[in-house]
A protein has these predicted regions:
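Short, structured surface segments that line ligand/substrate-binding pockets
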Residues: 108-111, 119
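Short, low-structural-confidence N-terminal segments
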Residues: 1-97, 193-220
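Charged, solvent-exposed helices and adjacent loops that form client-binding or oligomerization surfaces
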Residues: 70-101, 120-193
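Alpha-helical transmembrane segments
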Residues: 25-28, 108, 123
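Alpha-helical scaffold segments that flank or form the walls of functional sites
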Residues: 103-106
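Short secondary-structure junctions and interdomain/linker hinges
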Residues: 116, 145, 180, 201-206
Length: 220
């Protein structure tokens, strides 16, 4: 009788061990999948961020991602021309430069969405000189990408032109708000002391599931 009881206990123990072992394997697989990098090109039409209830895809914020990659890569070349990844992977101010640059790209995108909407509400428009200026800036950015970068970014020149027009209007709305409140324009930049007050009046939600895994630094 005692032998049967011991055998039953052993069987139960083994079954419990097997269940726990399988569960741990599944947990490891799920964790690894969550940490696996995702390619920008595979998720261009997926939502990257929602601002005040309106969704914006990775395609919509393509310029900001490319711009921050460009500027960060330029800094990386100054830091170590032959081993630029050394700079990208630096840990400073409590964060990795790669992550900091990516988050800044998102912050810029959200900032411009908010101010562009202000421009629409105020019915602002660009003068002919302002239009020419943003067109030239768009051309410069597009040409700097070169053919390979343009292909990898996956958006058309027309989409980039539209983004720059929106940015120009956002900047005009930012200047109007600064003038109205008698402060310097820069106070409403992403890191400006008064921008947080503006941001607090809006809601935004980042698609963290994809954003955290985005292979930033290898888009263009």
């Amino acid at each position: 009788m005692a032998g049967k009881r011991e055998k039953r206990q052993t069987t139960i123990f083994l079954l419990a061990f097997i269940v726990l072992f399988i569960a741990s394997i599944i947990a490891c697989v799920v964790r690894a999948k969550r940490m696996q990098k995702v390619e920008y090109a595979d998720h261009m039409e997926d939502v990257a961020v929602t601002v005040d209830g309106e969704s914006y895809t990775f395609r919509d914020i393509a310029f900001y991602l490319a711009y921050k990659e460009q500027t960060t890569q330029e800094q990386a070349k100054v830091y170590d021309l032959e081993h630029t990844n050394e700079f990208w992977n630096l840990h400073t101010n409590g964060s990795f430069i790669r992550i900091e640059a990516k988050d800044t790209a998102m912050d810029m995108a959200v900032h411009d969405v908010i101010f562009y909407r202000m421009a629409e509400e105020e019915e602002l428009s660009l003068s002919e000189d302002e239009k020419q200026y943003v067109e030239n800036k768009a051309d410069d950015f597009w040409n700097d990408l070169e053919e390979e970068g343009q292909k990898r970014l996956g958006v058309s020149k027309g989409e980039i032109d539209d983004t720059f027009i929106h940015m120009g209007l956002a900047q005009k709305a930012q200047q109007l708000l600064a003038d109205t409140n008698g402060v310097d324009y820069r106070e409403y930049n992403v890191e400006g002391s008064m921008y947080q007050d503006v941001l607090d009046e809006h809601t935004y939600k980042i698609n963290e599931k994809l954003w955290e895994r985005l292979d930033f630094g290898n888009i263009i």
